Amino acid sequence: MAINTSRTQILFITIISFLILAQNVNSAAFTVSNFDPYKTNIELEGNAFISDGSIHLTNVIPNSAGRASWGGPVRLWDADTGNLAGFTSVFSFEVAPAGPGLIGDGITFFIAPFNSHIPKNSSGGFLGLFNAETALNTYQNRIVAVEFDSFGGNSGGNPWDPAYPHVGIDVNSIASVTTAPWKTGSILTGFNAIAFVNYEPVEKNLSVVVRYPGGNFVNGTSNSVSFIIDLRTVLPEWVRIGFSGATGQLVELHKILSWTFKSSFQ
């Protein structure tokens, strides 16, 4: 009887271990409320750095670009079953002027192959994701991003952008597939924003909402945009998730203050 009990316990432990491992493989979840360069699992590229508990995606100088991404791969879909994961990414950020005058260029939340790295010459309107050779070449890229573009296609701006600051969804190109105006009065007053990026795998709906919860000028202000996309047609099974930012001739602050991410398969 003791032998059978022991075998039963071993079998039970084995099954539980397998289920825990399967859950870990098929889901991802983390929350970072204070970024520590020595403890946080964040990979920095380009000009990105961590200071005072926040990720700074760029230096406060012209033509700066940087990326910060989670240090491990995230499973976006299952190649054996074809099942898609749903996910929610919630992060607070600050885009603020570094001085008087116009500001630029913006930040993104991106999803790319895990072996992806920041391209050379990706400052300015390329937002740390593309360069002149890849920006509009949809066949060369494998990337989906949500951009928060503070400059837009103003006089002397980028020809692929609408003529106003905007929130956009990018698919393999810097030219967004859909955009909504970004009420950037909040940027000029220095308020922090909270962005909610959600992917619903059944409807294949990628949606974005950005809110400014504080301050008299922007209290309750929100912007939203969504796009139907099957992420399996664009991205590999395992991906890198993170943020990018860039300045061009104009300069602004680009800070990620906190980040919560959760993905799961149904």
Curated annotation (Swiss-Prot):
Top-rank taxon: Eukaryota
Glycosylation sites: N121, N205, N219
GO BP, one annotated term: response to symbiotic fungus
Cleavable signal peptide: 1-27
Molecular-function GO term, any one: carbohydrate binding
Family annotation (InterPro entries): ConA-like_dom_sf, L-lectin, Lectin_LegA_CS, Lectin_legB_Mn/Ca_BS, Legume_lectin_dom, Leguminous_Lectin
Any single Pfam family the record assigns to this protein: Lectin_legB
Induction per the UniProt record: Accumulates in roots during colonization by arbuscular mycorrhizal (AM) fungi (e.g. Glomus intraradices).
Entry keywords, A to Z: Glycoprotein, Lectin, Signal
Role noted for this protein: May be involved in arbuscular mycorrhizal (AM) symbiosis with AM fungi.
Family the UniProt entry places it in: Belongs to the leguminous lectin family.
PANTHER family, alphabetized: CONCANAVALIN A-LIKE LECTIN FAMILY PROTEIN, LECTIN 7
Protein name per Swiss-Prot or TrEMBL: Lectin 7
Species: Medicago truncatula (Barrel medic)
